[in-house]
Regions:
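Short acidic capping loops at alpha-helix termini that bridge into adjacent secondary structure
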Residues: 55-59, 86-89, 170, 177, ...
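N-terminal small-domain helix-loop-helix segment of the aminotransferase-like
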Residues: 1-64, 68-71
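PLP-dependent aminotransferase-like
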Residues: 77-140, 144
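Active-site phosphate-binding strand-loop segment of PLP-dependent enzymes
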Residues: 119-182
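PLP-dependent enzyme catalytic core of the Aspartate aminotransferase-like
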Residues: 158, 309-310, 315, 320-354
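PLP-dependent aminotransferase class I/II
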Residues: 12-14, 107, 199-277, 281-284
């Protein structure tokens, strides 16, 4: 089965990752890490500190980006750390990952959805609207997804800075950047932002750009002054030492993953060229490892069957407002070609029957 429905990695891991796995000494697992004795969390956090220019104490490590989101939302929606008064509201973008809502509900939090706007062939945040909405509601948390799943749009560093500068300083901002780096390689904005704004968390992962969702390594960066949260999220006895070895190899393999990102760009252009001009289709711009496509709903059943026969799975969206959309993981060229050709063939067959 070809899984193009969960934004996984249909490519080979880097050679450095393969070698790290082959050369890992199983005896290492018989002992805890000793780096915590040096006042550090992990060899991963030390390396991330070097790469991103953020103090190691402000680097967060979790078991996947999912764990980062859950820890942050559960912690900050429980009790307002400054006043002791409960403030359980979080603002979440419309047309975003359903998991955000569920995590907020798990800890008794309440959520409101703020608008994400469709503009021609893209979705976009209205920055002034986000600022106005946040000031009016004054939530404990504001969640921004950049890139956003499933719409594929992102925020610029300038837009993030404008939001941070103009909202209440006691609203904790959580930016989910799980799908970052496929288009822009800029990370220089992260250190200045987390050093300037104490109410900011930027969450990333090795699951998407680095193609290791099965490794379950998430990381992030937090503004200064959150010792209690850092203690809450850190692991006293350290982290999975096998994951550490593989993660270090992945972080040292950018050249490999940039080539993969180039193949994904080829896929974006193929979908745009082959499907974008067909009546009833709209191929949305995406800066993530997936693409959202609006399609004629009349071909849904035949398309599902055709993909099933060829052992391909893509995401048929069911979210309100996106019921006529497909989300397809960008994958190897031959896989992309099969999916694109199948969609086009189903469309042409359906229109020929009318």
């Amino acid at each position: 089965m070809n899984y193009l429905d969960r934004n996984e990695f249909n490519f080979e891991p880097s050679q450095k990752v393969v070698e790290a796995i082959k050369n890992f000494d199983p005896k290492t697992l018989c002992f805890y890490t000793r780096i915590y004795d040096q006042g550090k969390k992990s060899v991963i956090s030390v390396r991330l500190s070097e790469i991103y220019g953020v103090d190691e104490s402000q680097v967060l490590l979790t078991y996947g980006g999912e764990d980062m989101l859950k820890n942050a939302i559960h912690y900050f929606l429980s009790v307002n750390s400054q006043t002791g008064a409960p403030n359980t509201k979080i603002l979440i973008p419309e047309f975003s990952w359903w998991y955000y809502n569920r995590v907020a509900s798990e800890c008794g939090g309440t959520f409101e959805m703020y608008p994400l706007h469709e503009k021609e062939d893209t979705f976009a945040y209205d920055i002034d609207e986000v600022i106005e909405y946040t000031n009016r509601v004054h939530p404990r948390m504001l969640l921004l997804a950049s890139p956003n799943n499933p719409t594929g749009n992102g925020l610029t560093p300038e837009e993030i800075g404008r939001i941070m500068e103009n909202i209440p300083s006691d609203t904790m901002v959580l930016i989910d950047e799980a799908y970052a780096s496929f288009i822009s390689t800029d990370t220089a904005y992260i250190a200045p932002l987390v050093n300037k704004y104490s109410n900011l968390i930027i969450s990333r992962t090795l699951s998407k750009f680095y193609g290791l969702p099965g490794l379950r390594v998430g990381f992030g960066f937090i503004g200064k002054g959150h010792d209690q949260f850092e203690s809450y999220i850190n692991k006293y006895l350290g982290y999975n030492r096998f994951s550490e070895a593989v993660a270090l190899a992945a972080l040292d393999s950018d050249e490999h993953y940039r080539k993969v990102a180039d193949d994904m760009e080829w896929g974006r252009q193929l979908y745009k060229k082959e499907l974008g001009s067909l009546p009833g289709f709209k191929v949305y711009k995406s800066v993530a490892n997936f693409i959202l496509i609006k399609y004629p709903i009349a071909i849904k059943e035949s398309l599902m069957e055709a993909l099933k026969v060829q052992e391909y799975k893509i995401k048929f969206m069911g979210d309100k407002g996106l019921e006529e959309c497909l989300r397809i993981t960008l994958s190897r060229k031959e896989q992309t070609q099969v999916v694109c050709d199948t969609i086009k063939k189903c469309y042409l067959q359906t229109t020929a029957q009318k």
